Amino acid sequence: MSLLTEVETPTRNGWECRCNDSSDPLIIAASIIGILHLILWILNRLFFKCIYRRLKYGLKRGPSTEGVPESMREEYRQEQQSAVDVDDGHFVNIELE
């Protein structure tokens, strides 16, 4: 005798929805929160690189460049840009021989 014949299978009545009162405000609120959470999660996954780069580098104000020669300002800008460019490589490819 196989195991499949000994397992009880639920009847059609067992799969029916038991929450007939779907106009309950708690159920509606939970549904709205769930949908909003899903939308925000999808947007986060789509734009996380832009969002976190903006948070990491965009909100920080650099040191004041008052009284600093233009050549040093340009050097500082290049260093900052190279730091941003390096940050693009979150994922590293490792090749095994």
UniProtKB/Swiss-Prot annotation:
4Fe-4S among keywords: no
GO molecular function: monoatomic ion channel activity; proton transmembrane transporter activity
Virion surface side of membrane: 1-22
Gene3D superfamilies named in the record: 6.10.250.1640
Positions of transmembrane segments: 23-43
Stated name of the protein: Matrix protein 2
Subcellular location, principal: virion
InterPro entries: Flu_M2 (IPR002089)
Site (Seems to be involved in pH gating): 41
GO CC entries: host cell plasma membrane; membrane; virion membrane
Lipid-carrying residues in chain (S-palmitoyl cysteine): 50
This protein's domain notes: Cytoplasmic tail plays an important role in virion assembly and morphogenesis.
